[in-house]
Amino acid sequence: MKKQVPRLSMEEMTPALQESLRPRVERLGYLGEFFQCAAHQPQALMSFMSFTEDLKEALPDNLTEVVALSVATLMGNAYERVQHERLSLKLGFSRDWVREVISSPGDGHLMSAPELAVQKLALAIIERRGHNTADELEAVVESIGHERAIAVLMLIGRYVTHALMVNCLELAPQVGSPLV
């Protein structure tokens, strides 16, 4: 595919964006191609990153990873799915749990009731474009409370946005899946 969007190196990015990305690059060991593209809008990218971090603070890791893995899988975003497979393992989740999240949407024996409710909501929102999801939302509110339910809704939107960009740009994972 022709790359319509030039990829920026760290050195080509604004100093503020370089500083913002440095910890992530050090943690991952590489500068992700998503960031190389999105860096053409440095302030928006930094806001996107801040939005992501705020939502990660609002939710426990297991729910964040359920949303990230579920949305990435349903949206066909291998780029993000592989990153979150790796992150989930680093956070201490088992390979079997990660496999269940990505292969058994809305059903499983390793996921907790709140995790299943969150996954069902995420899948329903995407599949139904947000319509007719009151039952799934109610289950999440009953399970984790309305404040966290709002964080889940926002996180779903964040990962859908990422997937749409990655899929349009035809970005591929820069590392292999740790599950193979």
Go through each PLM region and give its residues:
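Hydrophobic alpha-helical segments
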Residues: 1-180
